[in-house]
Amino acid sequence: MAPSLFLQVSSAKVPTVSANNPLLQSYDLPPFSAIRAEHVQPAIEQILADNRVAIEGILQSQGKNPTWAGLVLAMDELNDRLGAAWSPVSHLNAVCNSAELREAYEACLPALSAYSTEMGQNRALFQAFEALANSPEAAGFDVAQKTILEHSLRDFRLSGIDLPPEQQKRYAEVQSKLSELGSKFSNQLLDATQAWTKHVTDEATLAGLTDSAKAQMAAAAQAKGLDGWLITLEFPSYYAVMTYAHDRALREEVYAAYCTRASDQGPNAGKNDNGPVMEQILDLRQELAQLLGYASFSELSLATKMAESSDQVLSFLRDLAKRSKPFAAQDLQQLKAYAAEQGCADLQSWDSGFYGEKLREQRYSVSQEALRAYFPIDKVLGGLFAIVQRLYGIEIAEQKGFDTWHPDVRLFEIKENGQHVGRFFFDLYARANKRGGAWMDGARDRRRTVDGVLQSPVANLVCNFTPADSGKPALLTHDEVTTLFHEFGHGLHHLLTRVEHAGVSGINGVAWDAVELPSQFMENWCWEPEGLALISGHYETGEPLPQDLLEKMLAAKNFQSGLMMVRQLEFSLFDFELHATHGDGRSVAQVLEGVRDEVSVMRPPAYNRFPNSFAHIFAGGYAAGYYSYKWAEVLSADAFSKFEEDGVLNAETGRAFREAILARGGSQAPMVLFVDFRGRAPSIDALLRHSGLSEDAAA
């Protein structure tokens, strides 16, 4: 739990000793194309050394009577310089992974972890922050400044500031090892994903697949110097087989390879096995929690979250499961009945996607593939920008002539009343050596520097969509459109902040179980006729989504929503239970089985090793926090219900949401911000209604 105070990821303007290392230069946007693996470690070591010297100077001048500018802003400058170098390295490691860059990245992790712990356990620094918090000056601080001091003192305690020296030393060792293991988990998953392919030479094997999916597979084969088609475990390829392939044996083969990645099972059993890595991570997290006086890592994780206790989280998840499970059982029964009609009497995990899509097509006469033609990327982006321009009063324009890490990357600028607000990069398409999934990271924070200059924010928005092929633009499925809106919601949270203090601007300082509110909130416009009118248009003719197709799509919105809900609750409960009960003698697999007994309606085969690829909790920020998606969905659904009342493109309500939620970042508790916008505490009713799981839906 590195203190947020000490590793803000941002940009910098501190002079440097090296004229040749791009990571040690001052820059507006990172010089991505100039960054080499050999630059990484020397730059990070130099900055850490410089920062240590600078902190000694800060403590000498601020030890007795600290001031905001002399202490907090001075520390911001140091954090910013470190972030300016580390952010592009971490980003490139995720989107352009290579053996050399990976080695350089990993070589820095122990030093960064040690520095973070050292800062968090620096008693003189802690005392300076404590003195500032108790000073007469602090009485006049604004709410954001007070929150930063409160978070800082909390983070010192969560870094072991109160521990005796031996335990502090052990804390540092555990944090360093956890940093290394998280990276190892991620690397082994990426390597396992890349390690399996299936070369197909008979097109009949691919019966049922769409032309676009086959074109991608042909391109993948060509890239390896092969004829025919190459199936990979990158998500667009996997999804295409599981959803459309008529060949049941092919579906089973690809499913088995995908769900056993980085495990002791499947075609590459024992290679890149994340099983031992998970056990080590769980042991160390439990040790960390106990060092800091918490019963479990779940309890420790809640120290920085909106939820008040483990019991509250578990009650919330179990209540949702109880409400959802009857709907899920009904969904599964209908799917099994349909599959049996089609000649599949024993529905298995590799059949559910295929028959689910066929049942959706039969019931609603709509398929993801038919919809794809209406969502060319530029139309979707134009509509997305039009929606947020109308809601939030901003302008978005594409920029040219910038340094990049790949030719597909695009850069956009946000302005308000002609004034620069921030910029964001889009890296939208799947490719080799790029981490799977979709994410936003804040590449630079909005903040007022020690010189009084306002630094504007920058965000990286990354997805893994199917790229353009054979002269067509990239065409998105509606699911991909929703993913784009989700990540853009995160981006707006980071970019539209009005807070000028780095510690709580944008997504900084936001409780993890509230951070998904703006992202899940944005998804709603993908399901509203007014939103769809702006983001859809046939890629050849430009004609809007036909009314009948629109109606079918909206009717199909909650198709199998019970199954989808219990699947997410399975992930959430598994994660929380795993961290709450570690050490009770149960294995990871046994915890998962227990959760499935409680909430699941369909069991995967015994060889399934889903946890081995659950990067969110083993290599991301969601450990004992995956429940945050559902927790924040209650907030986002209820917030959106205000737009349902006022009009989904109502500018006044949009401005109110911006000012209450987006503009204020982590400067106040999420519940305070929510109540400011909604006028009351959140209710679960909107989530149940939006998901088709309310009593009305059952009637």
What spans do the regions from the language model cover?
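Intrinsically disordered or highly flexible coil/loop and linker segments, enriched in small
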Residues: A49, V53, G57-K64, W68, ...
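Short His/Asp/Glu-rich catalytic/ion-coordination signatures at enzyme active sites or charged loops
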Residues: L24-H39, V89-C108, E130-E173, T232-P276, ...
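Short, hydrophobic/amphipathic alpha-helical patches that form generic packing surfaces
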Residues: D80-H91, E150, R154, A256, ...
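Active-site-proximal, well-structured secondary-structure segments within enzyme catalytic domains
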Residues: A144, I148-E150, K177-E180, N187, ...
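Alpha-helical segments
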Residues: V9, P15, S456-V458, H478
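Short pre-active-site segment immediately N-terminal to the catalytic Zn-binding motif
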Residues: T466-F485
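C-terminal, non-catalytic "cap/extension" segments appended to globular domains
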Residues: F6-V9, V14-H39, Q46, P66, ...
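N-terminal helix-rich structural modules
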Residues: L5-V9, K13-L209, F643
